Each structure stands twice: as structure tokens, then as C-alpha cells.
Amino acid sequence: MKDDHDKEFVISILRNSGLQVQPIPKATHQTPDFRVMMPDGDVLVEVKSKDDDQQLRNLLKSPKGTPLSYKVSLIETCIRDAWRQIHDFPNRDEANFTLVWFITRKVGGITVLTNSFAMGLLYGTELLEGRKVGRKEFYRKECFFFRESIFFSKKKCKDLDGVVLHDVQSIKLCLNPYSPRYSVFKHTTLTNVFRVKFAVVDPEEMEAAGECFIAYCSVDREDKNGIVRYLKSKYDLDTVKIIRFVPFNYPVD
């Protein structure tokens, strides 16, 4: 869901950051919301937002100890629909960058979809821990593209350059390293504004800094053992354990 207030709010953020924004008039065909005009090229942007989360409301009303089994298909559909609005835009140039701005939680909203949760949908992240070969050095790091994800899948959002995750606490630009324009988009005026004023998630920069692992391989994402073998070989890992946290309804008495 999205209303005009969301779009105008995002436009005001960008304009206050010194960027030139041109709203795109509504038409009978699919259109993105606006265009960010830069010396590096234009960025077509579609804004989407997450309303109050009925799944979380159901959990809060459930018996004590009930785990949350979260269905992410609606979120993925929302992002794919946003991408199609950009992709099918008749005035889109192949050189245009593409960006989905996703408001994951509004002020006063109730949702489990925090930015960290949404990042898992984009990047297929898993938290891994274990020890390295020989030195037995302990590690705990996130692994990008360990499982199927929006950016990894060529069928979901092909050549989408990035997604902005926006909640009441932070605004992050998540770069897609699988986009054919990744190496250019990461150095654009828009991305540089995010680096200075907000935040940028760039898996390759994080890997170079030793902050994460990346499963850059063609192994089927259903083959977890195959992914683990790849990571062990790439990073000299001895043991690999997946760490997952599941929300439960445990009210404070």
C-alpha cells in the first residue's frame, strides 16, 4: 500500500539532500513515481510502503509461547510489482538506473518487518558461526546470498539497481551487486548522498573489510551443503553453523 503522502515525503527527503527530483505524471499505463536527475544519469524510483502487520497482530493475540511463522510472499510481491512499474515504463531508457524505495514501517505502525528482516529478503542472508581451519579462530558473520533472494533471482527483479529500506529509525540504500550497472551505480551522486547522510549496504565493500561472507556461486540455493562447501573452500572455514532467531509471544508479566 502507498498513498501520495509517502511519495511526497520521500521526494522532500531527496530534495532536502540537494538532489533534483521530477515527479512523473500518472497515466493509463504503469509509471514509476518520480525521476532523480543527476549528472551520472537518471534514476527511476517507485515508492512502496508496508501497512500495519496483521501477522504480527495475530502473534500478539496468540497464547504465550506461540512462534511467529512469517509469510514473506506478500512483501516479495510488493517489491516485484514496484520493479515492474519501473521496468514497463514506456519512457524508460535502458541507461536509466532503477530504485525501489520501500517504507518498511511508518510512524506508529506495527510490523515485524524491520530493516534487518527486509535485508534478508533482498540478500538471502544467514548468520553463520564456527571456526576457521588451522588457527581454530572463531568467527560469526552474515553470509549474503546463502539462500534464494530478490537480488539473487534472475526471475524476480532482473537488473534492479537497489532498494531503499526506510523505517522510523534508519534509511538504508541496499545495492544489488548482481545488477549489470552495479559498478557504476555505487559511485553515482545519489549513492554518495546516502553514504554521507544516511547509510549504504554494499556487500562487496563489507566483504573486503572482513565484515561478511558472500556466496558468489552457481550452486542451487536449495543445496545448503553445497553452499557450505563453497564457503569452506573460499574462506578456509573448518566448521559452519547457521544461527537463526525465531520471534515468540513471551509477554512480560
Language model regions located:
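A short acidic/basic microdomain associated with nuclease active sites
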Residues: 14-39
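Metal-dependent nuclease catalytic core centered on acidic motifs
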Residues: 1-4, 10-16, 48-253
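Beta-sheet entry/capping signal
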Residues: 42-43, 99
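Conserved catalytic cores of phosphodiester-cleaving nucleases, focusing on short active-site segments
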Residues: 34-36, 43-51
